[in-house]
């Protein structure tokens, strides 16, 4: 039974990672009693925070790369004068 619960939790998080595209599937599973609505909502919140952290990290890396590129371009312009 513990393995089944673990598999259901894993499925819930897999569905949440692809939210909102999987919302209708999860809704049907909730209606059938295969996953609990509380778990589904928690999984959505957890994965949203996870995705936000990834996006924040990507954005900060992009800002660093842009500032480095801007600095290089600025230096190259000075060399040409």
UniProtKB/Swiss-Prot annotation:
Region (Disordered) residue spans: 55-81
Protein name: Uncharacterized 9.5 kDa protein
């Amino acid at each position: 039974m513990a393995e089944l619960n673990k598999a259901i939790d894993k499925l819930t998080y897999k569905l949440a990672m692809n939210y909102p595209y999987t919302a209708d599937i999860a809704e049907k599973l909730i209606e059938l009693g295969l996953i609990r609505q509380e778990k589904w909502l928690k999984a959505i919140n957890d994965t949203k925070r996870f995705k936000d952290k990834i996006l924040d990290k990507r954005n900060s890396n992009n800002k660093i790369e842009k500032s480095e590129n801007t600095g290089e371009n600025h230096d190259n312009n000075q060399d040409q004068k």
